[in-house]
Curated annotation (Swiss-Prot):
Entry keyword set: Glycoprotein, Membrane, Notch signaling pathway, Transmembrane, Transmembrane helix
Residues bearing carbohydrate: 141, 193
Region (Disordered): 106-175
Species lineage: Eukaryota, Amoebozoa, Evosea, Eumycetozoa, Dictyostelia
Localisation per UniProt entry: Membrane
Protein name: Gamma-secretase subunit Aph-1
Membrane-topology annotation of the record: Multi-pass membrane protein
Organism: Dictyostelium discoideum (Social amoeba)
Amino acid sequence: MTQVLFYGCLFITFSPILAFFFMVIAKNSQLVILTIGGSFFWLVSILIAAIWWYIIPPMREHWWFIISFSVLFQEIFRYIFFRLYSYGFNDRPSLNQIKETQHQMALDSMRKRKQAQQQKQQPPTNEIESINNEIIDTTNNNTNNNNNNNNNINDDDNKEITEEEKEKRKIEKQKQREIEINARLETLSARPNHTLSSAAIGVGSGVAYGFIMFGSILWESTGPGTLFSPACPSVNLFMLSSIITLFMTLLHVVYNVLAFQGYRSKKYHLVAFVIITHFVTTYLTLLNLPTKTTSCVGSILPIGIITVFSVGFCIFSLLKSDSITKIH
């Protein structure tokens, strides 16, 4: 029975977010890197909150005090990650842009070289007048020499044309090779849109939250016997924690998408919504403590309602701003 409980809680908690990861994020290497970065920044924020909890003794006895700082550090690092993301994806050129710039520079240099060769072939105006005077003064005996000179000039033009064709063919081959390389490395060079990028970062934060906050509790379910929630003696503690962790992991994805959209488009009411609901849902978990006035229903039901509302609000805001299809 303990193994069934373990795998049941495991699949309930991580199935939705891992399904989204393998079906959407794992197909693009940049999204995978962003997911790892989201996990790292969330772990750093929790590490700083733990240090803060350790160096201030009064915080060890009051959960509401440490929760406020924990949420605050998470939001600060979310904004720091957004600044890094905006610098790396907006202010820096992509691989395709770099290749296109190099190709354009090669074409410009070839065009300048061609213009310089044409200027060398054209004599000055004074020389043209003197040549015309000499042609008028010359006799018919010089016609053969002029024909020979014209033939030599035509030969030189043919040589120059062949050299230009060789350069064009060389550049075309190089461009074709670059197109083939970009086609093979499409997942590397393709830049995902902002919505997928922010969702990938949120998935990283949610997975890290699930494994850190619920992993140790879930492992205890493999032991003999079972535990019940102090706030609801008839409810299994592992199942209750699994459902709450499921809601929180989904909220991490939604919070990151809304916060990044708010920072990017300067819609700060989205950022305010994220911060307020993050505080509310985190404080609602305190209702699971063993006190006379708490109840697990008062915790899990509001968190579930907030999760459903937040997901709907996130989809509505994305469709309204057309952020799902925008790349830049």
